[in-house]
Amino acid sequence: MGNIRETNIKRTAFSLIENYGEVFTKDFETNKALVTKYTTIESKIIRNRVAGYVTRKVARMKVY
């Protein structure tokens, strides 16, 4: 069973991928810095969850 993400995390991640999809990579640390750059998220926990979700989606998109 996988982890279920909150709607606001998914919404933010999809918005970032839609607007800045070409800059995100499969590397979590890089994506974490990019999420900080492109959003106003102050919470470290939420930022990491968004970055992790973006990393997962980008990795799956580039496989196909």
Swiss-Prot record:
Natural source organism: Methanosarcina mazei (strain ATCC BAA-159 / DSM 3647 / Goe1 / Go1 / JCM 11833 / OCM 88)
Name of the molecule in the record: Small ribosomal subunit protein eS17
Pfam families: Ribosomal_S17e
Recorded family membership: Belongs to the eukaryotic ribosomal protein eS17 family.
Any single GO CC term annotated in Swiss-Prot or TrEMBL for this entry: ribosome
Gene3D superfamilies the record matches: Ribosomal protein S17e-like
InterPro entries assigned: Ribosomal_eS17 (IPR001210), Ribosomal_eS17_CS (IPR018273), Ribosomal_eS17_sf (IPR036401)
UniProt keyword terms in alphabetical order: Ribonucleoprotein, Ribosomal protein
HAMAP family, A to Z: Ribosomal_eS17
Molecular function per GO: structural constituent of ribosome
GO biological process: translation
